[in-house]
């Protein structure tokens, strides 16, 4: 049974676990991000089943990408980024593994070093000095100009989500007009590979 008490009677009531709280109780509530790679049959309805698993149980999808990965086009790789407690993430992986067309499920965040990248197209509308500043920042971030008019640029940029966020935030005061992002793709470093 949980004990609750006021820490200071002069302050508003804030419940907290008293002396009988265990480390496992605290770990159960810690949230973490997980990058999960799923190898599936490339057939109609598979993506809907994966999304249904998340939405039906109230799990959030932070990022989702999917594409065929073999020459024959029979396998697709789904990369899902989600956030939850360790127990929730383990439950997600177990439920994904039970779906019929799933060949393999891997939590890349736990299986060792991995690479994660996103692609973004970023439209900036500006004139004069802000336009030059946008070009300087794009050069510093290694963003490519893929379209330019007298009043706008479209930059193409690849990198970590944090790098893209930083560039986008710097473009806001300059004249950020629109952003389109792919979502995260990820792969393990070294010799390990996601195989059926």
What are these regions (language model features)?
Residues 4-6:
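Tryptophan (W) side chains
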Residues 13-39, 43-76, 81-196:
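Long, contiguous binding/interaction regions
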């Amino acid at each position: 049974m949980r004990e609750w008490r006021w820490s200071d009677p002069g302050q508003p009531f804030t419940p907290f676990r008293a002396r009988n709280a265990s480390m496992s109780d605290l770990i159960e509530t810690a949230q973490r991000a997980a990058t999960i790679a799923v190898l599936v049959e490339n057939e109609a309805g598979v993506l809907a089943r994966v999304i249904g698993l998340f939405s039906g149980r109230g799990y959030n999808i932070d990022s989702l990408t999917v594409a065929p990965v073999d020459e024959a086009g029979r396998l697709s790789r789904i990369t899902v980024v989600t956030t939850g407690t360790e127990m929730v993430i383990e439950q997600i992986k177990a439920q994904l593994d039970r779906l019929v067309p799933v060949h393999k499920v891997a939590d890349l965040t736990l299986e060792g070093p991995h690479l994660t990248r996103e692609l973004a197209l970023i439209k900036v509308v500006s004139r004069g000095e802000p336009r030059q500043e946008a070009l300087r920042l794009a050069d510093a971030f290694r963003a490519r100009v893929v379209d330019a008019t007298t009043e706008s640029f479209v930059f193409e940029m690849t990198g970590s989500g944090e790098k893209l966020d930083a560039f986008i935030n710097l473009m806001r005061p300059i004249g950020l007009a629109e952003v389109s992002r792919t979502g995260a793709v990820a792969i393990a470093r070294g010799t390990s590979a996601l195989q059926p």
